Amino acid sequence: MSETSGNDSATSTTATPTSAPVAKKVPFERTHHGHTFIDDYEWMREKESPEVIAHLEAENAWTSAQTAHLEGLQNSIFTEIKTRIKETDMSVPNRRGNYWYFSRTKAGLDYGISVRIPISGPDDWTPPEVGEEPLPGEEVVFDSNIAAEGQEFFSLGSFSLSDDGSRLLYGVDTTGDERYTLHVRDLITGDDLADTIDGTFAGASLDPSGRYVFYTTVDDAWRPEKVWRHVVGTDSSDDVCIFHEPDERFFVGSGFSRSGRMMFVVTGSKTTTGYWSISADDLEAEPQEIWPRVDGVEYNVEHAVIGGEDRFFITHNRNRADFDLVDVPVADPTAPGRDVIVTESGAGTDGELRIDDLRIEDVDAFADFIVLSYRRGGFARVGIIRLGDSSSPFAPLQELPFGRETGSLYVGNNPEFEQASIRLHFTSMSTPAVIYSHRVADGTDTVLKRQPVLGSVDLNAYAETLLWAKAADGTDIPVSVVFRKDLHRFDGGTASATAGTGDGADEMNGGAASAKVEPAPLLLYGYGSYEASMDPYFSVSRLSLLDRGVVFAIAHVRGGGEMGRHWYDQGKTTAKKNTFTDFIDVARHLIDTGWTSPDRLVASGGSAGGLLMGAIANMAPELFAGISAEVPFVDALTSILMPELPLTVIEWEEWGDPLHDPEVYEYMRSYSPYENVTEAAYPQILAVTSLNDTRVLYVEPAKWVARLREVGANALLKTEMVAGHGGASGRYDAWKEIAFEYAWILDVLGRSDIEIEA
């Protein structure tokens, strides 16, 4: 335990630091509900302070010194990633209006290049085959590499085209703070128009005609609160605010339906949704509320035409926590809706699916069918409902099959209302992403692209399985696992593994638990917040861990959405500790069943998953050799007590309101990582953050590491000085960030000296 001598300066950097930075202490009192917390490191919140910058730079210098022996390994991992990824590649073209749009990446360039070619005719729905050479008639729509020249950071937050392809709206962020400047480009001349709109939120859109821009601005707490209408060719000072949301619990956004016939304004808190519509025939009309906004009711809206009548498809939780799907007339949306999927009696389903088994997540409407995205049995699924006429509007829901139960099927990019096929993406822990085209009329599937994995990779070398760990309260927690078959083997026959063939076709059904001959080095990932599902997915960069004998696992803990709405409800507000204990119980299960051991187990999580990392570090430090926390939300109570901070008020429905509720205050105080650091034998800890992160401020991990170091923990802090919540923006720098973190993890696991062939 160490302290400064009381001088007012933070530790200064040296060329080669020989000791960790020791942050000065400036006691700051935080008093709420009769409790006072003394925060010695709150002074680090002053982002513009030279002293704070000096401290962060000193931390970076110390981290560099402590990981200098891993530079060779970092370079090797970076080279492996670079070798295995097809640097010069192209996406599958999507039709929009009279063009096929797609993107290209080129070796040596950080960002993608958006291009297009004209369709051959109105019946041209077959995407052209794209190679490395430009196609006849190919033209560049937007080259992010040119736009990013001279910038240390570059991100697009809006990218919207007019239906005729003559105009492009794009929004640029060059600092990482997620505040975008909008521009309109004339795609006929290639020149930007005079229109420039600063300080917007992501997700601005151009109306189908290309005449109007709709965008959102934020308040002082970075909450999107207003929707504006801009007429292209006019000064932004003349823009009209068409919607203002004063309630600080709600974000506001806008966008157009796939049909192009409706513009929506959407307000959303963590528990409540509101929708307003404007007909594209009169975009200067007032927004009309679709359903009255009711606390606790969430819904999403899509527009379609059935039997010549405009209808809204609405997914909602008015009557069922896992959502229902109805359709209502646009002319009278509060009229009683028609059930699109009916219950387990069999009518309206294919005879096998029961609506009670589905967590409905989204609906996409097309001219002749709708596509339903939902969760069943813990995994992402997709179903089709064909549309008829007004007398028989809905065919039975047909779930689309795929080859592996442990994989995930998603709806891809499908911009055209009239298209007869839909794009689908399939992936699993051992299956690189496959893009399919599914023709609804006859059910045929066509593979359009397989994620390329270059180098000497043998996809058959990897296996995946699904385990179930028992939580302390008896709940079964799913755990997705992937590993190299030739480096690990099972005994006892109590579980089997799925061999990765790269096409998602061959399956050996995964079992319950498995025992390994000897404990393996294992990286356990978790998130568990916002009902976000951490579905199994393939990662090229992860191969650098697997090939060095590391097993990778995802703990699908409560607070996420994997098993339905109840899974989320049991891991939020005053049930939040279930997220932490679930992760700990998964770790114990993996140890007890022989998969790993405490000296070979590293935990990883980011953002709200970083809160999970901080909590388990305090609650069960003995289970882990290391913890990697990316942009970690580790000073949760302080942040949620400050309504002036970005995202705080809207977050009260996720974590509770400790500012006004003493019970919530005490509950959060009992787990918030920063103020629960204690004298303990902590595992090695790496915290990575970004100075310009608006979502989780850099100050949280900075304070946390200072406090950890105060009690003797081996903790490192790495701050990206020009980046936001997502880290570096260029793909090569992003790969270097991954290589840095993987090298640290391998070092903790004792695998840093293993050389592999890329």
Language model regions located:
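Cap/lid segment of the alpha/beta-hydrolase catalytic domain
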Residues: V141-F159, G171-D177, D191-L193, H438-T444, ...
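Alpha-helix capping and helix-loop boundary segments enriched in small/acidic/polar residues
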Residues: L156, T196-A202, V218, W222, ...
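Generic beta-strand/beta-sheet core signal
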Residues: G171, R185, T216, H230, ...
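Conserved structured core elements
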Residues: L135, F159-S162, G176-R179, D207, ...
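Active-site-proximal cap/loop segments of hydrolase catalytic domains
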Residues: G493, G511, I554-A758
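Beta-propeller folds
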Residues: M1-S421, H425-A433, S437-D442, G493-T498, ...
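Active/binding-pocket-proximal capping segment
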Residues: D281-L283, A321, P329-P333, E344-S345, ...
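Active-site lining segments that contact anionic ligands and/or coordinate catalytic metals
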Residues: F251, G260, T272-Y275, G296-E298, ...
